Amino acid sequence: MKKLTLFIGLMALGTTSAWASCWQSNSAYEINMAMGRVVVSPDLPVGSVIATKTWTMPDNNTIYVTCDRNTTLKSDAKVVAAGLVQGANKVYSTAIPGIGLRFSRKGAISMIYPDSYTTTGSSFRLVGSTFTLDIIKTSTTTGSGTLASGPYTEYGPGFTILKTSLNADAITIVSPSCTILGGKNMNVDIGTIKRADLKGVGTWAGGTPFDIKLECSGGVSVSGYANINTSFSGTLATNTSANQGVLLNEKTGNSAAKGVGVQVIKDNTPLEFNKKHNIGTLQSQETRYITLPLHARFYQYAPTTSTGEVESHLVFNLTYD
């Protein structure tokens, strides 16, 4: 009986001596994932990354967890934010409609939260790794507002060594939209001129004014805004540059006029193509009606002209920032 008792005691002692002791050497590194104002383009496909930001861990070789011998530990990457719901491809939906978040780390082991892996060592660091936040468009219609503040993720080998959070107003989502009144396609009849009205390359004649009318909704939070920008493009007329605003005659066949295109004018100046033009700013939950007045006229771009029809296409693009 005494031998049996002694044997059990020795076995227990041997088991205890095999255990490693690990402790947290330094407090967790913390990241405030501030990205400021993030504007969502209405034309962005569902599943696209709206915005992304990567943080590099400090290159100071800080040891966050220490063990008294080589030890195998399980490292967990967890999402701890309240109210987030995991969806497909580890994208978490937020309280803002159509807006999702994806969290990831890259280093010796790359992972998308939530995830885990085992690693062996006596000291555990963050140096050489990065943390990335992707903001994802999860539905066709997106809302606006500020992402909730508080803790979002935790990572570490048995002890938390990396934390991420958002402060108040750290990320504001802006989902503006503009509707072109009258539809996306517009036909402008610029009338008729005589061939003799054009006096040579670089001269113009005739023409008519036309308006592009927009109804724009800010769809932003109290602290948000959105700039509305437009750009114009088309096939440039021969021997002209983008700042002359002259479109090639795309009419073909025997009925097409030769050497004559269409010049577009804005504010009494040729409209520069492929350039961003700011046409307004939307404030909090504001709806604005914007009219963009333009003028189209005939323009001679070649030394030789002929009578006939002129047909050109102008492409109008809207962007937000």
Curated annotation (Swiss-Prot):
Key words of the record: Fimbrium, Signal
Subcellular location(s) of the protein: Fimbrium
Database matches in Pfam families: Fimbrial, MrkDrd
InterPro entries for the chain: Adhesion_dom_fimbrial, Adhesion_dom_fimbrial_sf, Adhesion_dom_sf, Bact_Fimbrial_Adh_Pro, MrkD_recept-bd
Signal peptide annotation: 1-18
Chief location of this protein within or outside the cell: other
Iron is among the record's keywords: no
Alphabetical list of PROSITE patterns matching this protein: PROKAR_LIPOPROTEIN (PS51257)
Any single GO CC term annotated in Swiss-Prot or TrEMBL for this entry: pilus
Gene Ontology BP annotations: cell adhesion involved in single-species biofilm formation
Key word Signal present: yes
PANTHER family: FIMBRIAL SUBUNIT ELFA, FIMBRIAL SUBUNIT ELFA-RELATED
Family (UniProt): Belongs to the fimbrial protein family.
Listed name of the protein: Fimbria adhesin protein
Gene name per UniProt: mrkD
